[in-house]
Amino acid sequence: MQNRPIIIGVTGGSGGGKTSVSRAILSHFPDEKISMIEHDSYYKDQSHLTFEERVKTNYDHPFAFDTDLMIEQIKELLAGRPVDIPTYDYTEHTRSSKTYRQEPQDVFIVEGILVLEDKRLRDLMDIKIFVDTDDXVRIXRXIKRXMEXXGRSLDSVINQYLGVVKPMYHQFIESTKRYADIVIPEGVSNTVAIDLLTTKIAKILEEARNSK
């Protein structure tokens, strides 16, 4: 492993394709030590609240995340030390008692809707990516995902999108585009942008090896 891991931040609105872009990067480097860390793993522990209070959680607001812990653990990984990353129980709307061990890698993809919102987290990143997708495309994906995977009704998904997801996107997420080094319109279907990005990452990895 090289001396310091490369940290790549990938953000964008819910349903915008950031996870697909992250997976495209992962698949492009099958022989590298590369892992993805999701901001969603760091939703705050809400075990002190009643279930009725927990179900009202606004998961698209910065306050929902324990970003302090994420920053602390990324710093540990940068120092070459393993960490135990939390997991979140969406059924109970609180942090699970389970964790998973993340070993040091050469590259980490830090993915989530608000990973560019906190300057302390941005400052740890070598490449910052914003996946820019039209509202109409994002809501169509969100409806499909929530109805097929979570069994939710069309009305409930649309109401959540209009009442929470869309306003939070425009209040907190869209503005972080200005911090991005690379903006990828239309996500993973933009093969030119993906090719340019993976070429840049490969160059950074090669330079790191040659500097040893």
Curated annotation (Swiss-Prot):
Biochemical pathway: Pyrimidine metabolism; CTP biosynthesis via salvage pathway; CTP from cytidine: step 1/3; Pyrimidine metabolism; UMP biosynthesis via salvage pathway; UMP from uridine: step 1/1
Gene Ontology cellular component annotations, sorted alphabetically: cytoplasm
This protein's record includes keyword Nucleus: no
Root EC class: transferase
EC number(s) given by UniProt: 2.7.1.48
Keyword Cytoplasm: yes
One GO MF term attached to the UniProt entry: ATP binding
Catalytic activity from the UniProt record: uridine + ATP = UMP + ADP + H(+); cytidine + ATP = CMP + ADP + H(+)
Residues that coordinate or bind ATP: G12, G13, S14, G15, G16, G17, K18, T19
Subcellular location: Cytoplasm
Listed Gene3D superfamilies: P-loop containing nucleotide triphosphate hydrolases
GO biological process: CTP salvage; UMP salvage
Keyword field: ATP-binding, Cytoplasm, Kinase, Nucleotide-binding, Transferase
PANTHER family, sorted: URIDINE KINASE (PTHR10285)
Family that this chain belongs to: Belongs to the uridine kinase family.
Protein name: Uridine kinase
UniProt source species: Streptococcus pneumoniae serotype 19F (strain G54)
Primary gene name: udk
